Structure formats: C-alpha cells, structure tokens
Amino acid sequence: MEYFPAPLEKLVEQFARLPGVGYKSAQRLAFYVLGLPRDQAAEFSQAILDAKDRVHTCPVCQNLTEGDGPCAICSSYKREKDTICVVAEPKDVIAMERTGEYNGLYHVLHGVISPMNRVGPDDLRIKELVERVAQGGVQEVIMATNPDTEGEATAMYLSLIHISEPTRHLRIS
C-alpha cells in the first residue's frame, strides 16, 4: 500500500540514503523541502549540483577544493611545507584549522582502515601520501586520526610502512 505519491516517496528514499538519516527523518526532510517555495527548492537542488560539479579533491593533499588545481592550503606560501598532518576525512581539516594552532600541510586519507566495513589500506589515499613524502622536503608526519580502534589501526599501519626515512612520525593525543 502506497502512502505517498511516487515523487514524494522517491524524495524520502533519497534522503534516507544519507548517512545517519533514518526513514522518519527522511520523511521530515522531504516534507520540509516540499513546503519550500519553488525558488528555494530550486536553489537547494542547484547547490547540490554545483557542489557535485565544482568540488574536487586537491591533487596534492586530497582535501576538497574548488577546481582542478591545488587547494588554498597547499598553495599558500605561509604554510610550513615540511610538516604533513594526516587526517581521515576533509571535515578533520576544518576542525584542525579552527584551532588556529597548526600551520603545516595536510593529507586526507578519505577514511580509515576498517576490516568490519571491508576498508583496507588500498581503499585509502595512502599511496598518494607515500609518493608525496618520497618527493622529499617533508621532515615530520603527524598522525591525527581518531583515537578509536580504526583510527589507531590506521596510524599504526602508516607508521609500520615506513613512509620515508628519516621523516619523524608523531601521533597527536
């Protein structure tokens, strides 16, 4: 038995595909969007399409950036180029930047090693990190993955593969 018109049900299903959004929350979001004036709904859908079309990964650090070239952090002459802070997700870069305490570069892995979720080292941006450090000039690699089991496993793996010697490896607490 169908409770909603097909287009509304499809919208609910799309919202329910988002992480952390269950069916009831998806219904609330769908009804909210349905109640928006047409121009605001169009702005919302256009913002999604613009983000998909214009946001890419930085070819240097793998963070998100607009366009195809290096991001603002990698391009900045004010950053310490000999230090790389390794984080799991782009949102972690934002968190680090908000502290105002770190002035080096980043490398975003886009996940952590998680055997339960079938995510191994080859699924992450580890190869890019190894290549980047091998180019030289990096004195310090700071592991800033979360202190949970998966974050610790990822940091341990990175320390065991000896990214590059004599680079100093640190773990934040």
Language model regions located:
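Conserved functional loop/turn residues at catalytic and ligand-binding sites
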Residues: P19, G137, T167
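Single conserved hydrophobic/aromatic residue that forms the stacking wall/gate
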Residues: I161-S173
